């Protein structure tokens, strides 16, 4: 299996399976001197973790990071950073009955067709367990971006099934298990998810992610566009079926006079472009959203075939998320941070001597 690495100057390679002994990653290209300690990974890893509420998978992993290399006396050395998390709560017997069956809507069939062999335990490499290491690598990128440029990356759940936020408050996002920006709606979400779990079905979701403080100039104009690489990064997350930058698909119904972000010396008057023009950051907030499909691991029977081609009904037992989007916010944040750090290093390598060009337009102003 190839294509397990991400990035150009700042790269991340992940490895491991859902029910293997461990998962891990190698982070290469991190500048030396960044202070980092194992306990700094805990917050974001726990934000992504399952088993924290009745609305996610009951699997409980400690997700304790081991730093194997690339850090000496608490500081990065500039050499590859090896990170490892040992799996401790696998329950592979849950998959014995479907080991030879292809779950509809899952990667079982495509992995089988590509490789002629697959690990059925928990989805193997196609499991969202892999994203744990993306979040771990993202901790490094987030810290470097914040210290070096003041960039803050954060996200929230912007749709759960048919439900959308009735208001917005960043302070509310971290105070509920949904990363929902309107606290008054949390009871409604709880009721909705309780009914969904009882029915045995699943539902899709949407996550928005925002990076504030991104300087103008990051990104490359043709094949290394910031928005193209960000879209690819978010699309690589399990279950993601669509990505928007800025207004995205809503742009189809807009007029040019509405969509263009007017510029004044005091700042841009809007941000329909999502902080990116011509593949290069404008200095405004970089905004993106991703849509996640409903999980296909259901306890409701569904028609499929097995490895022999026989028609069967598949029922997935075990521990699964009825909505994978609930835990996806820290994953989206991590992928945006990884893209931004890689682009920042590439910009510095080629254009570091350019300096600040006038006029420098501030980000969006309140109108």
Curated annotation (Swiss-Prot):
Its EC number is 4.2.3.5. Pathway: Metabolic intermediate biosynthesis; chorismate biosynthesis; chorismate from D-erythrose 4-phosphate and phosphoenolpyruvate: step 7/7. One of its GO terms (biological process) is aromatic amino acid family biosynthetic process. It comes from the Bacteria. Keywords: Amino-acid biosynthesis, Aromatic amino acid biosynthesis, FAD, Flavoprotein, FMN, Lyase, NADP. Reduced FMN (FMNH(2)). The keyword Flavoprotein applies. One of its GO terms (molecular function) is FMN binding. NCBIfam families: aroC (TIGR00033), PRK05382.1 (NF003793). Homotetramer. Belongs to the chorismate synthase family. This is Chorismate synthase.
């Amino acid at each position: 299996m190839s294509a397990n690495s991400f990035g150009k100057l700042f790269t991340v390679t992940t490895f491991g399976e859902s029910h293997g002994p461990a998962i891990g990653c190698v982070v290469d290209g991190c500048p030396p001197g960044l202070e980092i300690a194992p306990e700094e990974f805990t917050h974001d890893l726990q934000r992504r973790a399952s088993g924290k509420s009745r609305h996610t998978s009951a699997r409980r992993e400690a997700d304790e990071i081991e730093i194997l290399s690339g850090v000496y006396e608490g500081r990065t050395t500039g050499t590859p950073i090896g990170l490892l998390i040992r799996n401790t709560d696998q329950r592979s017997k849950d998959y014995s009955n479907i080991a030879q069956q292809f779950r509809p809507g899952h990667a079982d069939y495509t992995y089988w067709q590509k490789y002629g062999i697959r690990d059925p335990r928990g989805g193997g490499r196609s499991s969202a367990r892999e994203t744990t290491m993306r979040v771990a690598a993202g901790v490094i990128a987030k810290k470097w971006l914040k210290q070096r440029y003041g960039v803050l990356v954060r996200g929230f759940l912007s749709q759960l099934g048919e439900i959308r936020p009735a208001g917005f408050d960043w302070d509310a996002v971290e105070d509920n298990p949904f990363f929902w920006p309107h606290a008054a709606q949390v009871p409604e979400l709880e009721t909705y998810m309780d009914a969904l779990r009882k029915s045995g079905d699943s539902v899709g979701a949407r996550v928005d992610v925002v990076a504030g403080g991104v300087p103008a100039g990051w990104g490359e104009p043709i094949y290394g566009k910031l928005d193209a690489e960000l879209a690819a990064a978010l699309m690589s997350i399990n279950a993601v079926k669509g990505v928007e930058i800025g207004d995205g698909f809503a742009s189809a119904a807009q007029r040019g006079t509405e969509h263009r972000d007017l510029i004044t010396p005091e700042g841009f008057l809007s941000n329909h472009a999502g902080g990116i023009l011509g593949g290069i950051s404008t200095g405004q907030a970089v905004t993106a959203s991703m849509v996640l499909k409903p999980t296909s691991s259901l306890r409701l029977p569904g028609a499929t075939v097995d490895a022999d081609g026989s028609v069967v009904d598949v029922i997935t037992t075990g521990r699964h998320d009825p909505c994978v989007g609930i835990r996806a916010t820290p994953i989206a944040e991590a992928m945006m941070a990884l893209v931004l750090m890689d682009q920042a290093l590439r910009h510095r390598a080629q254009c570091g001597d350019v300096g600040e060009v006038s006029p420098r337009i501030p980000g969006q102003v309140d109108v």
